[in-house]
Regions:
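Walker A (P-loop) phosphate-binding motif
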Residues: 17-84
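Generic beta-strand or strand-like secondary-structure segments
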Residues: 7, 48-56, 97, 115
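Charged, amphipathic alpha-helical linker segments immediately N-terminal to NTP-binding catalytic cores
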Residues: 1-11
Length: 192
């Protein structure tokens, strides 16, 4: 019953991606941006991957910073810097976890472009990682990493509202890396 709406949603998503990339595609930041996201709704393991990358990049001499939407936090205004001694109710639990565990600067804000600009203006970062920003096309990016839950994969393969996908499976062919989190189901090889 929702299948016809899925076609509308998928078409609007493609049009939105095309428009935002055309409008904002030429902009760059003073540091490269690595976006870690997914094409399905729900938990896929993005934050643990981001945290592992932050730690490895620091060992290799990089000075990473992180931007996040701050889902679950009360803050709804312009971007703010996460205080590692602050409360998850303000920033969201994942940004606070990243700030505490990785000891790196984290900025939360719904507008990721503004969050990146604030991060780079206030900290000596030479690399930015965006937690769950794959569909935030107004934010220029250098590298895209899509995380897929190996046990759930893509559900029924349909986009919202008929299925769990934010974008079609074909979107994975445009990202730089696909990371599979957890054991892969038997149907994965033919899909991937």
């Amino acid at each position: 019953m929702l299948r016809p709406l899925e076609f509308v949603y998928r078409g609007l998503s493609k049009l939105r991606r095309w428009f935002l990339r055309r409008r904002f595609g030429g902009r760059q930041y003073a540091a490269p941006v690595i976006v870690i996201g997914n094409i399905a709704v729900g938990v896929s393991g993005k934050t643990p991957l981001l945290m592992a990358l932050v730690m490895q990049l620091r060992l290799r001499g990089f000075k990473p910073g992180v931007v996040s939407h701050g889902y679950g936090g009360e803050h709804r205004g312009p971007p703010i810097i996460v205080d590692s001694e602050g409360a998850a109710s303000i920033y969201g639990d994942k940004p606070l976890l990243i700030a505490r565990q990785c000891a790196c600067p984290v900025v939360v804000g719904a507008n990721r472009d503004h969050a990146v600009r604030m991060l780079l203006a206030n900290f000596d970062c030479n690399l930015v990682l965006s937690d769950d920003g794959l569909q935030h096309y107004a934010m220029p990016r250098t590298v895209e990493v899509a995380v897929v839950d190996g046990s759930r994969l893509f559900g029924n393969g349909y986009c919202l509202p008929a299925g769990p996908l934010r974008e079609s499976i074909a979107r994975l062919s445009t990202v730089d890396f696909v990371a599979i989190n957890g054991p892969i189901t038997d149907s994965a090889p033919e899909i991937l």
